């Protein structure tokens, strides 16, 4: 007996040490930019963090975008409780840890679909932009995969506790539980003499009921109107694009029809296969869920909300693996294997996703020196368009005082804070500028404006843009602490600088501002009076800067 137990334990360890390194390698290939330069992203910075600061642990039950996301909020709460300055790194690594756990369970779970580690590898080799890879907010996309696994779990295994935990955590983190519940009830019809299966299905039903209740009462969950006339696009976007959409998109129709025919023939050849019927149902269900959230006309696996291809591509990969591994027809096996290999090549153009550095730590160091501060939060990885996490001076001090990793900076951080207007807000007016044109010092080299030649009553625009963004030069202003001006720039900023001539402050790369933003020079470490030099040192046509000052 001891020998058998030892053999089983050895086999488990061997399986672990084979599975996890493969998963880690694939994860790093897809997420290395986020691991090297972790940032705060989307609703994680605008909902989850503020919600935890205000409500504590009870914020776990607050919906985001209309539904519960318990797992991402747990990552957020744990990470920020450890350190606010290191929050991007800690939360990113925890999110990647969730991905590895999902990879391991998919690779080793006793399920009725074949593939093992190939099923798990398929999840990390999807031919779509890795939007949901390595982000704490999107970790629920990964835990939701385990609901697909539970559907095909071998009922003879004595691991109901693990399945119960999966059902609770995944169902309370994603509406996908609504799609998988019917399959669990189908299982019960075949396993009605198994009380554990009945109990697990009732547990799943309870979780789905909670999720649906939240979705109904939040009045936020958005459902896009499904256009029946556009259904034909499913073949090209969700099936053809899987094989060839990133490398030869002009052939998506041909490959879409080929793959669809392959799936249909396989199901018809084995009508009594629960696994194939289950995968066919999940493929249809996940596609319908995707196009119910956003119009299919706006979806694209590389540039148009690629997260909505995540589940359909996973199920399609698993379906093709079943054909390649179990089909008796050599022709069908070779066809499925060809598409799977082609999909890996198709993933190469979208293997990783790079993003701009937002200097989270420097912004946090600046935060205590302003009455209020807006920490930038990524939307799509482009610094030109960000959201903001708004904190008061008191909140910043409280968070940093509890942070074991925080060390007071030897510099003053940013001398100014950037205030951006939401499109629905009133535009900036003359009263939002306190610096007059007579504060410009002799030797001004900014003799242009911005490309649109912006004009407001009582305001003067000075900029480095002449006939193009290739103009260079500098402008010096005499300012006082608390002064405000408006600023705008091109999409590039490598040669744009703002230098405050005061102790504790270094030369700062200018912010990217496609629209006018306010620069508020109210850092309490600034002297009463100081000079600021705005410089454009780049001859690139896309680089320029401009400021708005009062006319008198």
Could you tell me what each predicted segment is?
Residues 2-129, 158, 162, 186-187, ...:
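Intrinsically disordered, polar/acidic, low-complexity terminal segments
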Residues 21, 271-297:
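Transmembrane alpha-helix segments characteristic
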Residues 140, 300-325:
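Hydrophobic/aromatic-rich transmembrane helices and adjacent perimembrane loops
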Residues 148-162:
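Membrane-interface transmembrane helices that cradle and orient dolichyl/undecaprenyl
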Residues 165-186:
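Transmembrane helices and adjacent periplasmic/lumenal helix-loop junctions
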Residues 180-206:
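Perimembrane helix-loop-helix junctions
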Residues 454-484, 493-496, 516-519:
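Short beta-strands within extracellular/lumenal beta-sheet-rich domains
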Residues 501-545:
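Extracellular carbohydrate recognition and processing domains
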